[in-house]
Amino acid sequence: MVHSHTVRLPLAALALALVLPACAGVGTEPLPGRPAHHAEGGFRNTNPEFKRPDGWTRFTFFVRRGWATLTAPRTYEAPRRDNDGSALRAPDPGAPTITWVGHATLLVQLAGVNLLTDPHWGERASPLSWAGPRRLSPPGLAFERLPPIHLVLISHDHFDHLDLDTVKRLAAAHDPLFLVPLGLKQWFADNGMTRVEELDWWQGAEHRGLRLVCVPAQHFAQRSLWDANRRLWASWALIAPERRFYFGGDSGYFSGFREAGERLGPFDLAAIAIGAYLPQEIMRFTHTTPEQAVQAFEDLRARQLLGIHWGTFDLGDEPLDEPPRRMRAEAQRRGIPPDRAWIFDLGETRRW
C-alpha cells in the first residue's frame, strides 16, 4: 500500500521548487521605446551583470531545500518582546515609530498614518497549507492588536512577501489602500480587492499627506509556473515633511541603491534585507548579504539601518542566527556606531 506521505513528499518538493522565493529572475529583451525594465509580456532586470543561475543549479537547490524543509526542518526562535499593541493604537503623532512584526513585515507610524510593509501573518510562505517554509516564530504583533491600517506597501509577489490570507484579512478588517508595483493590481482584483493603486519604478503617489515612490529593485516575480516576471518587483520610499523612510523589500545589491539615495535621500531610516543569501550561486543577484546591506545603507545616505528579512522563514543555507551577527560586524568594521545599525527583537518598537 502506498501511503499518502510517500506521494506528498515528492509533490511538495516539486511545489517548493516552484514557489521558494530564492531563484534568479527570468531574463527577457527590452521593448523599443519603453522603459528599460519593461519587456515583452512582463519585466526584466537592467543590470548588465545580472546572471541567472543555470537550470541544474536551480533544480538541485530547490529539490534539496524542499526535501529538507519537509523531512528535517530547522528550528529557530528569534528574540522577542511582549507587545500588546496598546501603545501603537494610541500613538504620539509627533513621534514616528517602527515595529518589526517579522520577516519583511513592518508597522510604520508617521504623521498620524499607520502603514504596513509586505504584511504576512500566515504560518507558511507557500501556496500549500501542508508544505513550504513554515514560520519559525509567531508574529511579533498579533493581527488583532493592530491599530487601524491606512496604507499597505507590497514589494513583489513572492509568497514570503505577499500572503493572500493576510491581505484579505486586512482588506476586510481595515480597508486600507494597497500600493503595489505594476501588474499586481489585477491579482488583487482577481482576489476580490479593489482599493489598489499600482505604480511603475520612479512613479509616486500622494496619500494622507505622505508621498510614496516606487523605486527600482533587483529581483524577480513569480507565483506559479506560468507567470514568471509578469509583475514588477520594487522597493519603496516614503517621504513626509519630517521623515524619509526606505523599504527595500527583496533586492540584490546593485546601483539602484545609490540612485535612490541621490534622487530621494538622504533617508532617516532604511529597512534592508539581510537574510537568504546562501548559496551565493543562487542568491547573489537577487538578495543582499549582510555586508552588502550595510553598503546599500551607505549608498542610500541613511541615518539608521534596520536589518530585516531574517529569522522568520528558513529560505537560505546560512545559519538562521547569522545575518544579524554579520551585519553588526560589518557596521563595526566601517565605523558605524551600534545605535545606527539596528537589529530588532520580534515585536520591538522604536522611535525614529
What are these regions (language model features)?
Residues 2-11:
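Bacterial N-terminal signal peptides that target proteins for export
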Residues 11, 18-145, 181-249, 268-275, 326-348, ...:
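Metallo-beta-lactamase
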Residues 24-50, 142, 151, 158, ...:
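Cap/insert and terminal regions of metallo-dependent hydrolase folds
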Residues 51, 58, 130-179, 195, ...:
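Active-site metal-binding motif and surrounding structural segment of the metallo-beta-lactamase
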Residues 105-111, 206-268, 284, 288-292:
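Catalytic core of the metallo-beta-lactamase
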Residues 108, 118, 156, 163, ...:
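Divalent metal-coordination and catalytic microenvironments
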Residues 121-138, 220-227, 278-287, 314:
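Acidic/histidine-rich helix-loop elements
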